Amino acid sequence: MNTLQKIAYRSKQQPLVPLGTLLTTAAVVLAAKSLKQGRKKDTQRYFRYRVGFQAFTLVALVIGGMYYQKESAEQKQTREDKLREKAKLREQLWIEELERRDQLIKARKQRLEESKKELMKVAQEGFEQERERELKKEDK
């Protein structure tokens, strides 16, 4: 964000501060002009305006600062709440992922057990067939 963008952003946040600054500047310029022309009464009046405009600017700055401080505290709280929600969501997703992986592992173990039982059954049948062949050979 460059300087002009910052000025525009801050002016939108606190529109009375730039107004007070412009009025103060105008009062100083008019006071200098009337001083150069020798109009003492006008010079005094413009300097009094300057003081009033500066006071207005300061009050606007302080009130705006207090307002935005309160607002930024609310935004910070909202941001923290969002971060907490995001953390809870991530935690929930992680738990779901762990449960999914656990189910996959259980399913694999179950398939392994079934395969093991089937292999044992096939092996047992093979051994029995082998014994029968040997017994037939011995009988002959």
Curated annotation (Swiss-Prot):
Compartments it resides in: Mitochondrion membrane
Any single Pfam family the record assigns to this protein: HIG_1_N
Example of a GO cellular component annotation carried by this entry: respiratory chain complex
Primary subcellular site in the record, as a coarse category: mitochondrion
Coiled-coil ranges per UniProt: 68-126
GO biological-process terms attached to the record: mitochondrial cytochrome c oxidase assembly; mitochondrial respirasome assembly; regulation of proton transport
Membrane topology according to the record: Multi-pass membrane protein
Transmembrane annotation, as ranges: 16-32, 46-68
Keyword annotations of the record: Coiled coil, Membrane, Mitochondrion, Transmembrane, Transmembrane helix
UniProt KW Mitochondrion keyword: yes
Span of domain HIG1: 1-79
Assembly: Associates with the respiratory chain complex III/complex IV supercomplex.
Family: Belongs to the RCF1 family.
Role description: Cytochrome c oxidase subunit which plays a role in assembly of respiratory supercomplexes.
PANTHER family in the record: HIG1 DOMAIN FAMILY MEMBER 1A, HYPOXIA-INDUCBILE GENE 1 HIG1 -RELATED
Record's protein name: Respiratory supercomplex factor 1, mitochondrial
Gene: RCF1
